[in-house]
């Protein structure tokens, strides 16, 4: 099975940033970065890789940005707690996330412990069940004023770049697993 982001229009996943109105945090604004693309593997297999923070998820995050991804609790799906160390443009940031599954097998969410960012992975069939349409969306609470404006511009661009690399790594990882017969046909926890 060949995995890639299909056709020229989706080779680089479609991305958008949306800015919303003032939030409840004293003038802070919410903004969204969303990237979608097609992966040439069944949704159940793609979801299994994304939801497994012990074995698979660390292999798809771009190592040039993600220095560490440690599982503090759980490890697969809802209830997983992670600590992540990221380095972007020379700045290192460590934060904890909690994983929930509003729709197990289809929607997985990572929420920063302080609530400042929520990343949602949405997996659905792309045409047939042999391919997946994956959307990664992050909703972020920005600071007010000029600092928040700069933060929105910078963060939107960086997240798009990170997610495009994550898509490429996921497609390559799914190819590797299919080539060596390492895919699960069903997942008992779904």
Regions found by a protein language model. Name each.
Residues 2-73, 190:
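Hydrophobic ligand-binding cavity/cleft-lining segments
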Residues 81-87, 107-113:
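Short beta-strand segments that buttress and anchor functional surface loops
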Residues 27, 109-165, 170, 181-183:
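Beta-strand/loop substructures that line and gate deep hydrophobic ligand-binding cavities in soluble
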Residues 43-44, 74-77, 101-105, 122-133:
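A short, structured loop/turn motif at beta-sheet edges
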Residues 35-37, 71, 95-101, 118-125, ...:
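Hydrophobic/aromatic beta-strand elements that line small-molecule binding cavities or substrate pockets
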Residues 30-38, 44, 81, 94, ...:
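Intrinsic-disorder/low-complexity, polar/charged segments enriched in Ser/Thr/Lys/Arg/Asp/Glu/Gln
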Residues 39-41, 88-90, 101, 140-144:
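Beta-strand elements of well-folded, non-transmembrane domains
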Residues 179-190:
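Short, flexible loop/turn segments with low-complexity composition
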């Amino acid at each position: 099975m060949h995995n890639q982001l299909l056709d020229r229009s989706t080779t680089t996943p479609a991305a958008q940033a949306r800015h919303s109105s003032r939030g409840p945090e004293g003038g802070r604004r919410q903004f969204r970065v969303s990237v979608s693309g097609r992966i040439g593997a069944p949704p159940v297999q793609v979801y299994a890789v994304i939801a497994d923070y012990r074995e698979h998820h660390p292999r798809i995050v771009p190592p040039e940005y993600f220095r560490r991804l440690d599982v503090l609790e759980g490890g697969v799906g809802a209830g997983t707690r992670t600590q992540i160390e990221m380095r972007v443009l020379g700045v290192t940031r460590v934060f904890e996330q909690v994983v929930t599954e509003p729709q197990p097998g289809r929607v997985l969410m990572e929420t920063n412990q302080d609530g400042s960012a929520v990343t949602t992975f949405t997996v659905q069939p792309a045409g047939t069940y042999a391919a997946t349409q994956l959307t990664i969306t992050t909703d972020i609470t920005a600071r007010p004023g000029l600092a928040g404006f700069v933060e929105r511009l910078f963060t939107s661009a960086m997240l798009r770049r990170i997610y495009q690399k994550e898509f490429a790594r996921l497609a390559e990882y799914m190819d590797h697993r299919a080539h060596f017969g390492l895919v699960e046909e069903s997942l008992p926890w779904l």
